[in-house]
Amino acid sequence: MLKTYHIALACVILAVVVLLFGGESLSLEEWQEVCLNVKNHFLHNEELSSLSIIILEIRLPRVILALLVGASLSGSGVVMQTIFRNPLVDPFLLGISSGAMLGVAMAIAVVESNIAILAFFGAILASLAVLAMNRVLGNSVLSLVLSGVVLSAFLSALAGAIKFFVIPQKAQAIVVWLLGSLSLSSYKDCLIAFIGLSLGFIPLFLLRWRINLLSLSDAQSLSLGINPVLLRSLCLVCVSVASALAVSVSGTIGWIGLVIPHVARLFFGANLQKLLLSSLLMGAFFLLLADVVAKTITPYDLPVGIATSVLGAPFFLWLLFRTRGV
C-alpha cells in the first residue's frame, strides 16, 4: 500500500536524479570535483567552478522551485475541491491565473520589470474581487463559482488586448509566461514560493479536520459547531496567497490543481487528514517530472505548462473513464 513517506522518498530520488543527469549528465569524477569545490567554496571561499555554478545556480533552484510550486498548486486544488464539494474545481477558479496574467501583461508592456510583484498583486486583487462579488451575491458556492468564471473571462480579455497591441517581442514574453516556465528559476523565486506555501498551508494543515466537515452540507457543518462561511473564506484566503505567490514566479501551470487531488484520493481516500499532505507531495513530484519531460522531449526547453497539459489531460480522461467503469 502506498504511504506518504513513499511519495516523499520518490521526490528526493527524482530530485537527485535531475541534479545528476539533468540536461547533461556528469561523471563520478566530475561530481567528486563539484562536491569538493562547493565544500571549499563555503569553508575557504574558493571560487566556484563552471560545473558547480551549473549545479548550484541553474539545476538546484529549478528543482526546488518545481517542488514548491507543484505542492502549492496541488494542495490548493484539494482544499478547493473539498470546500466546494466539487471535483472539477481548481485553484484558478478564483481568477488567480487571469489576474496574474493581466499583471504580467501590464508589467511587460509598461514597466518591463517587477513582473513577479505585479503578477502577485494581480492574482490577489482578482481573488479579493471574486470574494467580494460572492459576498454581495449571498455567499453561496454557486455564486462564487460564477463570479470566478466571469471575472476570469474579463481579465483574460484585458490581458489579450494588451498582448495584441504590444510589439512582437513583448507579446512573445507574455505568451511564454502564460504557458508556465521554470527556466529562469532563482533562489529568490524559491523563497517567494516557500513563503506562499508556508503562509497558505500551515493554517490549512492545522485546521484540516475542520475543513473535512465542509464536505458536508452547510446545515450539517453548523450543527457540528463549524461556521462554514467563515471557515470557507479563511480557506480561500490561504489558497489565494499560496497560489498567487506560486503563479507569480512560475507562470500559469495548469492541470496540477485539478488532476493530482484525484490521484491522491485513489490511494488515500477523501479524508483531508491524510489527503492534504499526500496531495502536496504528489504535486511536487508531478511538476518536477513534468519539467524533466519538458526539457528532454525536444531539443528546446519547452514551457513546463505544455508538459503538464500533455501529461495531465489524458490522465484525467482516464480517471473519468475509470470512475464510470468504462
Curated annotation (Swiss-Prot):
GO biological process, one term: siderophore-dependent iron import into cell
Keyword Transmembrane annotated: yes
Transmembrane segments: 7-27, 64-84, 91-111, 113-133, 142-162, 164-184, 187-207, 241-261, 275-295, 301-321
Keywords carried by this UniProt record: Cell inner membrane, Cell membrane, Ion transport, Iron, Iron transport, Membrane, Transmembrane, Transmembrane helix, Transport
Main location: membrane
Localisation: Cell inner membrane
GO cellular component, as recorded: plasma membrane
GO terms of molecular function: transmembrane transporter activity
CDD domains: TM_ABC_iron-siderophores_like
Membrane topology: Multi-pass membrane protein
Function: Part of a binding-protein-dependent transport system for an iron chelatin; probably responsible for the translocation of the substrate across the membrane.
Membership in a protein family: Belongs to the binding-protein-dependent transport system permease family. FecCD subfamily.
Protein's name in the database: Probable iron chelatin transport system permease protein HP_0889
Organism: Helicobacter pylori (strain ATCC 700392 / 26695)
